[in-house]
Amino acid sequence: GIGAAILSAGKSIIKGLANGLAEHF
């Protein structure tokens, strides 16, 4: 469903942000 798609995208975005921050620190 749409909710699952949004959750999946959100998790991907959060993982991307976490990886980006890890590279800075």
Curated annotation (Swiss-Prot):
Record-annotated membrane-spanning stretches: none
Tissue-by-tissue expression: Expressed by the skin glands.
Top-level taxon of the source organism: Eukaryota
Alphabetized UniProt keyword annotations: Amidation, Amphibian defense peptide, Antibiotic, Antimicrobial, Secreted
Compartments it resides in: Secreted
Any Gene Ontology biological process: defense response to bacterium
Location of Phenylalanine amide modifications: F25
GO CC annotations on file: extracellular region
Protein purpose: Has antimicrobial activity, but no hemolytic activity. Preference on killing Gram-negative non-enteric bacteria.
Homology family: Belongs to the bombinin family.
Protein name: Bombinin-like peptide 4
